[in-house]
């Protein structure tokens, strides 16, 4: 019998945690559910379990995984352990697109929820502008990319504030609630489409893990080792933007997942993307789903949005990381 390698054991461990979260967290909430009532589909426990708890747990798992994997990609491309989708303004662009859709009352575009299309469009426009601003002699400067991303985030945030001041009270409440970032219940049709996008994108990215190991060292060196640097970079930005925009469209902007999880996983298991990517995906999902479970339990019957819980945990962690960097 073949023994599992240490790297395989890490992936298995995170996979078990992901599965356990999917099974246990739907039962965590402001009031308990009777397991026997759920098993026999008795109301109201069955409806609460299926329509509320399971859907938001699954959304938390896959949204957290998507944000964490996107953060891992951007950190590899920029060779900066603190890079996130927020760093490049992609999350802000997706947020602006979604807010515009809410403001204008768009429902569907070509049969697809308008907020999805608008978020993806906003992310794509910001990415194109940021990369274009940082492009010099067909090479992208990481420093210029970061500065362009910060500028784009500021501009998008300003436009969001302008729109917020123009909309009606009802829409302003919807926008402010959405901007907090949460994994409130979503219908299964939207959830199914989101999960499909995330799983397919994650599978494509993880198949390129070996090439990302080379890219994380140095793109020039990676090209001498046979990596198609330009193609890989474009696919990385595209995949990271798609994961971010798809998540923001359903959950609103949720910060720190794409920073905290890849950084923690990398410090514990190393920088081999063949292990880092799946573990970061699984770990990010567990973290965000757990934050949602905490938020709906600690001040019951009220709730704290998952984005707020994540910020409470992630903010001090970022300060600690920056302090460790300055000391070293």
Annotate each predicted stretch with a short phrase:
Residues 1-328:
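Alpha-helical transmembrane segments in inner-membrane proteins
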């Amino acid at each position: 019998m073949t023994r599992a390698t240490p790297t395989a054991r890490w992936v298995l461990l995170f996979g078990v945690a992901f599965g356990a979260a999917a099974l246990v967290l739907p039962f965590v909430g402001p009031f308990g559910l009777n397991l026997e009532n759920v098993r026999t589909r008795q109301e109201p426990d069955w409806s609460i379990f299926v329509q509320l708890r399971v859907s938001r747990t699954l959304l938390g798992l896959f949204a957290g995984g998507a944000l964490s994997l996107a953060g891992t990609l951007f950190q590899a491309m920029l060779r900066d352990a603190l890079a996130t989708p927020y760093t490049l303004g992609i999350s802000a662009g997706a947020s602006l697109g979604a807010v515009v859709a809410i403001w204008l009352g768009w429902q569907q575009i070509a049969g697809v929820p308008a907020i999805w299309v608008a978020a993806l469009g906003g992310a794509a426009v910001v990415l194109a502008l940021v990369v274009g601003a940082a492009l010099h002699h067909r090479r992208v400067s990481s420093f210029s990319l970061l500065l362009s991303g910060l500028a784009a985030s500021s501009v998008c945030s300003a436009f969001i504030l302008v729109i917020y001041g123009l909309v009606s009270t009802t829409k302003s409440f919807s926008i402010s609630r959405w901007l907090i970032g949460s994994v409130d219940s979503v219908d299964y049709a939207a959830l199914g489409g989101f999960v499909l996008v995330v799983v397919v994108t994650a599978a494509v990215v993880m198949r390129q893990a070996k090439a990302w190991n080379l890219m994380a060292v140095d793109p020039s060196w990676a090209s001498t080792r046979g990596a198609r640097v330009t193609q890989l970079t474009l696919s990385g930005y595209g995949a990271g933007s798609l994961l971010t925009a798809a998540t923001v469209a359903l959950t609103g902007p949720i910060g720190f997942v794409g920073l905290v999880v890849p950084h923690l996983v990398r410090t514990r298991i190393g920088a081999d993307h063949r292990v880092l990517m799946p573990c970061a995906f699984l770990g990010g999902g567990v973290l965000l789903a757990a934050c949602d479970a905490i938020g709906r339990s600690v001040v019951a019957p009220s709730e704290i949005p998952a984005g707020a819980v994540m910020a409470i945990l992630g903010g001090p962690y970022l300060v600690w990381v920056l302090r460790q960097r300055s000391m070293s």
